[in-house]
Amino acid sequence: MNLQIIILAAGQGKRMYSDTPKVLHHLAGKPLLTHVVETAQQLNPDAIHVIYGHGGEQIKSSLPNLPVHWVHQAEQLGTGHAVLQAMPHIPDDAYVLVLSADVPLIQVGTLQSLIECSQRQNPDHSVLALLVAELENPSGLGRIIRNNQGEIYSIVEEKDANEQVKNIKEIYSGVCCTLANNLKKWLPQLSNSNAQGEYYLTEIISLAVQNKTPITSLTAKNSFEVQGINNRQQLQQLERIWQQRAANQLMEKGATLADANRFDLRGELYCGKDVYIDINCIFTGTVVLGNGCKIGPNCSLTNVTLGDGCEVYANSVLEGCHIANDCHIGPFARLRSGTQLASHCKIGNFVETKKAIFDEGTKASHLSYLGDVLLGKNVNVGAGTITCNYDGVNKHQTIIEDGVFIGSDTQLVAPVTVGANATIGAGSTIRRNVPPDELTLTESRQKTIYGWKRPVKRERD
């Protein structure tokens, strides 16, 4: 079977009150259009056609790597007109699945079932399959009109509906599947004699009835699958539905969330056994948490891997890091891209790292900046240690070998190497390589000025 998918993404989204096209607004860290394209890809179609119009160049430039065929709708004349723009690129014998870019939570299983509905009869008597739903509040959506035998014979958009039709709870989702040959016959016959003055795709139902093409429907099991986004309130509602589903899936696999309503996932999160996640944590990109990991409150992890038994304390920010087993991080730590910790390392409060590689058992417990640095095993980094890695033009590396003890308030001016088991005295500024096994410090003589008086403020007149 040749499957062609059309995604409608040309709408202006006026009710978003935004300079950003509606389909680029984010849900769970990804644009709405990306959600729909990723779902469509799971059906293994022969092609995905995205119909763009309003803000089209912005959409294309923002999502340059989407595996789609872009089709321009120069004038936004309605959904039927939008689908018509893609038809020259689709063979007559292909099955066409029409989706909407602002309906991001449609499930692949539902779409697969709809495609199967459209194939149940001989292709010579092809079916028009519609995805429908029963909603308690169907406001704003097209209503399904059935005859006395329960057969669908029309869809009426709300702006064209009378009060009797508005009381109908069954709605059309905007998702349909049929042979391309049918659409190529029906779409040129659409009329714009309606309240919007547009060419509605829903009018193909009446044309299918006239042509005696069977119409079948599939009712979505979950109403959220067919919920569209037209304003920011609806975007927030679907965000919470997506997050709740993600939280439930994690808990089903053995993770504990302190409060599923205060958890945000903006990518992929893979958890081992007995993982604990406290409140207000944000996971972005791809995050892997090993067995027994604990994430404290108010943490942000982006593209991070944690080994077994790690603990990240409150208010820590980790990005682009690889952490081995049994490490402790935070509170208030910031680990930036390129940070790698071997097992049993500790990064304490108000420590920032970037391109820092720690070997086993190394600790930086307080108030330090460690950038472009290699640290050996069992190094102790004292409070207030700074690697001075930037000369205003280039970055330089610091190498700290095994067993080094660095006293508090030390500046290491890169490029510099500290030899194994060396000790650096507190308050030192190290500009040259430090020999192993020795104490190195920079001394400034302490001086006491006897009889010195503090300045006294004069009383103002």
UniProtKB/Swiss-Prot annotation:
Pathway(s) it belongs to? Nucleotide-sugar biosynthesis; UDP-N-acetyl-alpha-D-glucosamine biosynthesis; N-acetyl-alpha-D-glucosamine 1-phosphate from alpha-D-glucosamine 6-phosphate (route II): step 2/2; Nucleotide-sugar biosynthesis; UDP-N-acetyl-alpha-D-glucosamine biosynthesis; UDP-N-acetyl-alpha-D-glucosamine from N-acetyl-alpha-D-glucosamine 1-phosphate: step 1/1; Bacterial outer membrane biogenesis; LPS lipid A biosynthesis
For the region Pyrophosphorylase, give the residue spans. 1-232
Q: Where does Mg(2+) bind?
A: D102, N230
- Give the keywords, sorted: Acyltransferase, Cell shape, Cell wall biogenesis/degradation, Cytoplasm, Magnesium, Metal-binding, Multifunctional enzyme, Nucleotidyltransferase, Peptidoglycan synthesis, Repeat, Transferase
CDD domains for this protein? GT2_GlmU_N_bac, LbH_GlmU_C
- What are the required cofactors? Mg(2+)
Q: Where does UDP-N-acetyl-alpha-D-glucosamine bind?
A: 8-11, 22, 73, 78-79, 142, 157, 230, 336, 354, 369, 380
Could you mention a single GO BP entry for this protein?
lipid A biosynthetic process
Q: Which stretches does the entry tag as region Linker?
A: 233-253
Provide the reaction this enzyme catalyses.
Answer: alpha-D-glucosamine 1-phosphate + acetyl-CoA = N-acetyl-alpha-D-glucosamine 1-phosphate + CoA + H(+); N-acetyl-alpha-D-glucosamine 1-phosphate + UTP + H(+) = UDP-N-acetyl-alpha-D-glucosamine + diphosphate
Any keyword Transmembrane helix?
no
> Where, by residue number, does acetyl-CoA bind?
A383, N389, Y390, S408, A426
- Which GO terms fall under molecular function for this chain's record? glucosamine-1-phosphate N-acetyltransferase activity; magnesium ion binding; UDP-N-acetylglucosamine diphosphorylase activity
Q: Does the keyword Nucleotidyltransferase apply?
A: yes
Where it sits in the cell: the answer is: Cytoplasm
> What does it do?
Catalyzes the last two sequential reactions in the de novo biosynthetic pathway for UDP-N-acetylglucosamine (UDP-GlcNAc). The C-terminal domain catalyzes the transfer of acetyl group from acetyl coenzyme A to glucosamine-1-phosphate (GlcN-1-P) to produce N-acetylglucosamine-1-phosphate (GlcNAc-1-P), which is converted into UDP-GlcNAc by the transfer of uridine 5-monophosphate (from uridine 5-triphosphate), a reaction catalyzed by the N-terminal domain.
Q: What is this protein called?
A: Bifunctional protein GlmU
